């Protein structure tokens, strides 16, 4: 995240991260659990995902954090954070362009562009489009009344 940010690569805003139980805010400052809870209490629409061992949307979730409560589940921010475990990132929720959502609206569909070095140049492999599918451990809400 830090390298991409410094290289001006467009990425979702990172609100909070946790690695092995160590919380860091958007400025990469270390914060304790209570500070993390207070920090996220009014984020609004956001997305959390595991930072270790994730695949196909497993362990991911959409939240609407307002007034210390997740409006989607009714859980407190303290309960939400406790449930995310010790390795996760909480970030801005992104949405696909309408033309890509038409393919499958239940996930964020992405293009994967792989590059490699060949002799003295950088070459790109054929572009792959990753399309979500049903059956993961969470369902993306289609209508979120957040804030």
Predicted regions span which residues?
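Conserved N-proximal alpha/beta basic substrate-recognition cap immediately N-terminal to
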Residues: 1-39, 54
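Short, basic and Ser/Thr-rich N-terminal targeting/leader segments
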Residues: 10, 46, 56, 107-109
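An acidic- and aromatic-residue-enriched active-site/binding cleft used to recognize and process polar
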Residues: 16-19, 51-53, 93, 118
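Short, solvent-exposed polar/charged micro-motifs at secondary-structure junctions
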Residues: 22-27, 57-62, 99-104
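A short catalytic or substrate-binding loop motif that flags glycine-/basic-rich loops and adjacent residues
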Residues: 40, 52-54, 104-108
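Phosphate-binding site of ATP-dependent enzymes
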Residues: 44, 68-147
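Glycine-rich phosphate-binding loop of ATP-grasp-fold ATP-dependent ligases
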Residues: 45-77
């Amino acid at each position: 995240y830090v390298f991409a940010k410094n290289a001006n690569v467009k990425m979702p805003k990172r609100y909070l991260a946790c690695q092995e139980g160590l919380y860091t805010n958007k400025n990469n400052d270390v914060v304790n659990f209570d500070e993390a809870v207070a920090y996220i209490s009014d984020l609004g629409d956001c997305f959390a995902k595991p930072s270790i061992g994730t695949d196909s949307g497993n362990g991911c979730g959409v939240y609407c954090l307002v007034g210390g409560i997740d409006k989607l589940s009714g859980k407190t921010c303290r309960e939400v954070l406790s449930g995310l475990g010790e390795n996760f990132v909480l970030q801005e929720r992104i949405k696909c362009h309408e033309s890509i959502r038409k393919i499958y609206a239940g996930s964020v569909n992405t293009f994967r562009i792989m590059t490699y070095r060949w002799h003295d140049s950088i070459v790109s492999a054929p572009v792959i489009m990753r399309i979500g599918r049903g059956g993961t451990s969470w369902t993306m809400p289609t209508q979120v009344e957040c804030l």
